[in-house]
């Protein structure tokens, strides 16, 4: 079974503004409320692909109630969130002319020791063969090393742990047996404490890193320049499928969901990576997270190349 942790989910308030001006009253062309959070996005795409999953973290207040009600629209998602007193956050996602996207993400509520204990207890149901996805930022009040401790605990029990968290902690998670990490270029540079001038240099360092951890793999997303799946055995590259980009929110989360879909089917690494690429494309080239029909359409167009350094 797939279990997804999204500690700090949100309501994302999407606004489209034609000509945004600072220190002026601006009018939107359109607006929409969408439940969000990296783990929520992974969960929804898996739902769209017919894969059952458990989604947990913290919800509270009228915003938390709204998120919980919206999750009822997805029959393959089991709402396993822990209720807290403080309200869940609202983020602002603003799209302007020229495809410019600006985000304002709220910090969210603060959890106490009781809430942390409740989540720790919930995770104890994980067993050998399960998949655990740790996705998104830590919630205020949570120990900074909480993710790492979870990896330490469950990777040693036969749980495949995925991590998508913008922190140097991704590097530490490799030492503890994390199954897959998914940085973008910024996150990889943060993890390595280094800036890269060329992709070749970056991929070389990524391969050298993964050579040290033969049981782990890295999906490195480079936006419109494609993505890589890197392990101690291979380097695979997937060029971007061309099309009109509608929005980029949830692209990386869709990659994880696509990979999980392939894993759930028992497919090999190359097929999983193809599905990751198709799922990300289906989200980026539409106005919502990937739907199964669009996923299948783009799956036929995915090209995977093996590279060597």
Where are these regions (language model features)?
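Conserved phosphate/ATP/ADP-binding segment of small-molecule kinases
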Residues: 144-233
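Substrate-binding N-lobe of the ribokinase-like
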Residues: 27-88
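Conserved phosphate-binding/catalytic region of the ribokinase-like
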Residues: 171, 200-309
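Gly/Ala-rich phosphate-binding loop of Rossmann-like dinucleotide-binding domains
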Residues: 47, 155, 264
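Positively charged, low-complexity intrinsically disordered leader regions
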Residues: 1-23
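Short beta-strands and strand-loop turn motifs
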Residues: 103-105, 130-136, 164, 182-185
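Hydrophobic anchor at the start of a short beta-strand
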Residues: 2, 51-53, 78-79, 161, ...
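Conserved phosphate-binding/catalytic loop of the ribokinase/pfkB sugar-kinase fold
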Residues: 94-128
């Amino acid at each position: 079974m797939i279990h997804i942790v999204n500690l700090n989910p949100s309501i994302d308030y999407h606004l489209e503004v034609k000509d945004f001006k600072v220190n002026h009253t601006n009018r939107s062309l359109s607006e929409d409320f969408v439940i969000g959070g990296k783990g929520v996005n992974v969960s929804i795409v898996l739902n769209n692909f017919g894969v059952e999953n458990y989604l947990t973290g913290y919800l509270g207040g009228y915003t938390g109630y709204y998120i919980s009600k919206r999750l009822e629209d997805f029959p393959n998602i089991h709402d396993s969130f822990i209720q807290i007193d403080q309200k869940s956050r609202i983020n602002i996602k603003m799209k302007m002319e020229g495809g410019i996207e600006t985000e304002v993400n709220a910090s969210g509520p603060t959890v106490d020791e009781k809430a942390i204990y409740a989540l720790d207890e919930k995770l104890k149901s994980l067993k050998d063969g399960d998949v655990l996805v740790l996705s998104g930022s830590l919630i205020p009040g949570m120990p900074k090393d909480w993710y790492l401790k979870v990896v330490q605990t469950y990777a040693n029990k036969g749980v495949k742990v995925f991590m998508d968290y913008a922190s140097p902690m991704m590097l530490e998670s490799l030492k503890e047996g994390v199954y897959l990490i998914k940085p973008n270029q910024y996150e990889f540079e943060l993890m390595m404490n280094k800036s890269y001038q060329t992709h070749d240099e970056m991929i070389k360092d990524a391969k050298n890193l993964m050579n040290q951890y033969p049981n782990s793999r890295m999906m490195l997303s480079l936006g419109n320049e494609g993505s890589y799946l890197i392990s101690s055995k291979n380097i695979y590259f997937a060029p971007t499928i061309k099309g009109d980009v509608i929005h980029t929110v949830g692209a990386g989360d869709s990659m994880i969901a696509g990979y999980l879909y392939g894993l759930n089917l028992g497919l090999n690494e190359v097929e999983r990576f193809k599905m990751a690429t198709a799922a990300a494309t289906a989200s980026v080239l539409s106005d919502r997270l990937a739907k199964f029909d669009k996923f299948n359409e783009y799956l036929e167009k995915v090209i995977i190349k093996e590279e060597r350094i």
